[in-house]
From Swiss-Prot:
UniProt catalytic activity: urea + 2 H2O + H(+) = hydrogencarbonate + 2 NH4(+)
Annotated EC: 3.5.1.5
Stated family: Belongs to the urease gamma subunit family.
Name of the molecule in the record: Urease subunit gamma
Pfam families in UniProt: Urease_gamma (PF00547)
Gene transcribed to yield this protein: ureA
Record-level GO BP terms: urea catabolic process
Length: 100
């Protein structure tokens, strides 16, 4: 199987998000990389499902809460930018204050 660097990056996001979801299900609070992975994964999948940029920006704010993450993590993540592929091309989705 031959993957482009972009496809490898997306695959790594999926694996990291899967691990993070498993830890969350076990009741563990998420760290910084786990939080970023879950939000990024949901944005990429939302774009694949046909949601537009505005919908994804709103979705990104409702994926995780401060109760889901370790102390201080919500304050560390002020913005997340995800380059997502839409039917009409690639667009940058920015989520401001994704965890509150």
């Amino acid at each position: 199987m031959r993957l482009t660097p972009r496809e490898i990056d997306k695959l790594l996001v999926v694996v990291a998000a899967d691990l993070a979801y498993r830890r969350k299900e076990r009741g563990l609070k998420l760290n910084y990389p786990e939080s970023i992975a879950i939000i990024t994964y949901e944005i990429l999948e939302g774009a694949r499902d046909g949601k537009n940029v505005a919908e994804l920006m709103e979705l990104g704010k409702n994926i995780l809460s401060a109760e889901d993450v370790m102390d201080g993590i919500a304050d560390m993540i002020s913005d997340i930018q995800v380059e997502a592929t839409f039917p009409d091309g690639t667009k940058l989705v920015t989520i401001h204050q994704p965890i509150h």
